[in-house]
Amino acid sequence: ITDLSFVKINQVSNANPQQKNYKWGTVELTKWTSYKGLELEGLLYKPEDFDPNKKYPLMVYFYETYSQDLHNHYVPKPTASIVYATEYVSNDYIVFIPDIKYVDGHPANSAFDCIVSGTDHIAKNSWIDTNRMALQGQSWGGYQTAMLVTMTDKYCCAMAGAPVSNMTSAYGGIRWGSGLSRMFQ
């Protein structure tokens, strides 16, 4: 509660005490040019006590596009495999979420061009520990993670969550929720 001047503020509740357990960090929109000349954007999260003289591990997470979510708030919570930036920045990671612009018929090359060029762009910063860069994707992003580790050794580890690792067998697979085969979607 406050008066009309907003000088004196009195807190009357503490609805989310768990928030004190997080270092909320900052997020910024970063831009770069891909290897193939595409102008790209992505989100870059840093710890709230970010020190440019320190080296930070980098977590690269992706799924199509996220830059439109620059001002969205995601409540930290346990999840099957989605990277919540707040969890990582609270543990002194930098989190990079690049957008992917797909060229029809070339998903692998599109993902490589956008994700790896974005990683290179971020890795130019002296505060990135290039020996501790990781990659994570879920579902379609998991498929791309499994594919990317065959195309570059830039990442020291990778986690492919719920990936399709065999497109032929996945074509006849049953979709979660709908019960329909993928071939009918």
How would you label these PLM feature ranges?
Residues 48-49, 65-66, 164:
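Flexible, active-site-proximal loop/turn residues at the rims of small-molecule/cofactor binding pockets
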Residues 68-70, 168:
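Glycine/Thr-rich phosphate-binding loops of Rossmann-like dinucleotide-binding domains
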Residues 61, 75-185:
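Active-site-proximal cap/loop segments of hydrolase catalytic domains
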Residues 56, 63-68:
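Active-site glycine-rich loops that stabilize anionic/oxyanionic intermediates
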